[in-house]
A protein has these predicted regions:
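Conserved, well-structured core segments that form or line functional sites
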Residues: 2-232
């Protein structure tokens, strides 16, 4: 995996296939294949890069959906001015302090749920925001969930169903009720997928502080990336 703009050290990852599509077709979407929670017990930037190409799976209201992660953002603890952990400690944000491998779900603008994966050893805040996924299965379920939030608007193309953090959470049926759940079992889990050929790092989107940090990671040239104009 080639990373442009920000050099990182070697990142150990679970066994992967050569491509996300091959990974999806070679086995089941099964929680027995989930990435173990201990895998997330390490630096946030390492986890953020390694999440790209992994498969996010949810079974909510009996509906199975899955997609390949193509865009994420890393957020640190109190020293990261853009992090919720720098401003809050009580309420849903408590999930950012661990344990690792659990969900931190909050509502953006009071409307859209956003899903993060908690990182770092328990007691040290850190999380990776899931910003975009390329749908693999359950596309019509995703589309119905998205269209319910935008009645009367044109149908979304497949690559935009889970493009953007709010869109991803809605498409996968993730809400505030999932804050703090472990992400190695139903209703939401992560499985090893493929390894992207090239990953690009950029400034994070929609923040007013910490813009100099290149902590947004995307699969280069992927159509499901939420704001491709921000890829440099």
């Amino acid at each position: 995996m080639q990373v442009t703009s920000l050099a990182m050290g070697a990142v150990p990852v679970p066994e992967r296939q050569s491509s996300p599509e091959r990974a999806a077709n070679s086995g089941r979407f099964d929680p027995s294949l989930a990435v173990p929670l201990t895998w997330f017990d390490r630096p946030t930037l390492d986890v953020a890069q390694a999440l790209l190409g992994m498969i996010l799976v949810s079974v909510v209201d009996g509906e199975l959906v899955a997609g390949v992660l193509v865009e994420v953002e890393a957020y640190g603890g109190p020293d990261d001015p853009a992090s919720h952990a720098a401003r809050y400690r009580n309420g849903p944000v408590q999930a950012m302090w661990g344990p690792p491998g659990h969900a931190y779900v909050y509502r953006a603008y009071g409307v859209y749920p956003c899903c993060n994966v908690v990182t770092e050893p328990e007691g040290r805040a850190g999380a990776v925001l899931l910003r975009g996924a390329a749908p693999l299965v359950g596309l019509e379920v995703m589309r119905a969930r998205r269209q319910a939030m935008r009645p009367g608007q044109r149908l979304l193309p497949d690559e935009r169903l889970a493009s953007g953090p709010g869109a991803l959470a809605i498409a996968f049926g993730i809400g505030l009720e999932h804050n703090g759940i472990p992400l190695d079992r139903p209703p939401v889990w992560l499985q090893p997928g493929g390894t992207p050929e090239r990953v690009v790092s950029t400034p994070r989107i929609g923040i007013s502080r910490g813009q100099h940090l290149l902590w947004r990671f995307v699969v280069a040239d992927h159509p499901a990336v939420s704001r491709r104009g921000h890829v440099e």
